[in-house]
């Protein structure tokens, strides 16, 4: 797990500094809304992060075909890095128990959707380069 967590921090910091990335959610980043709580509750911060960009759905198609190291797959936890796009409209279509206010709050938070990235054991510099070549 330590390698997952170290790699995830490096990738989260890379994404947070990328001009096309609007938001990165990783509890290890000081910018995370619950970073202080996470520091109290966790020894480390996991290998899972989310990020948001404009036109995320369009980029999802490009990621499926152009990522070379990170695999486009819907799964959690693996020795390989995995990424998937979670579109807000798709999520809302299956969120029957949420009120209108809750759905509006989620859309405000997520925009048109977020990427979920499960960071694996690959070299974090290679992962950042892989993301950079797709993000442009």
Model-derived regions: residue spans:
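Ligand-binding pocket scaffold of soluble enzyme catalytic domains
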Residues: 1, 17-18, 113
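Short amphipathic alpha-helical segments with heptad-repeat character
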Residues: 1-5, 9, 118
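Conserved small-domain helix->loop->beta segment predominantly found in fold-type I
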Residues: 9-82, 101-109
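PLP-dependent enzyme catalytic core of the Aspartate aminotransferase-like
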Residues: 65, 81-136
């Amino acid at each position: 797990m330590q390698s997952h967590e170290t790699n995830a921090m490096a990738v989260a910091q890379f994404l947070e500094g990328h001009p096309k990335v609007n938001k990165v959610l990783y509890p290890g980043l000081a910018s995370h809304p619950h970073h202080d709580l996470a520091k109290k509750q966790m020894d480390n911060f996991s290998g899972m992060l989310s990020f948001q960009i404009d036109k995320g759905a369009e980029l999802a198609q490009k990621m499926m075909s152009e990522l070379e190291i990170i695999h486009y797959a819907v799964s959690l936890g693996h020795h390989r890095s995995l990424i998937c796009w979670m579109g807000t409209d798709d999520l809302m279509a299956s969120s029957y128990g949420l009120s209108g206010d809750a759905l509006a709050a989620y859309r405000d938070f997520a925009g048109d959707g977020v990427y979920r990235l499960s960071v694996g054991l690959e070299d974090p510099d290679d992962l950042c380069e892989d993301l950079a070549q797709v993000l442009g």
